């Protein structure tokens, strides 16, 4: 689909990266999944996949429909629908990852839809305006504050959403829906994301003025101010180091690159600054 549109459009990247027919399996998947109002089964697997970049489990050849929400069964369903692929092992278990950017869009969309089904909807019109301000005016603080406000509000409604997976997962899902950027995350270790580079889609929106490297840190809700200070200092060093990588320098091109440090204590954003 991509190559066909690209070559037949004078080698210009198509605005819609996703062919509609690929959504068929995604819709089937949503029909099969039980709407879990406690937000504990299917969504938690997706949150782990988004936050850590991978999930581990055992590939099942078959299982009854009523047991779809068991983690191994749900992961197997994702595999058979092509939403994850096998990428080796981790601690003796099969390691599953998202295979490509097209599928990544579906996974993030599923996560956002699951939030919405559980009453965790966001003001789309407001967020669209903040996305525009992020890209063209450099208004990064209001953009990330809006995400933070949503996280705080939603976690107050459902205690089980509290935690690092929810904070990271929701932030990544929201940035993935930003029409002006493609979030690129690095995996320096098995513990998850270290940095997020909001790669400006300059081939589509040639007048984007700003790009961003974001270091997102998390501490528990009972963490002290000293712990937050240490996390902030670590984040500042890491975000500056990441900003100097070749991938970021080439991706940012002529835009103004911002180095953003964010620290959450529980579900409350306590640091949001430019380094």
Describe the role of every protein-language-model region.
Residues 247-275:
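Domain-level recognition of nuclease-like catalytic cores that cleave nucleotide substrates
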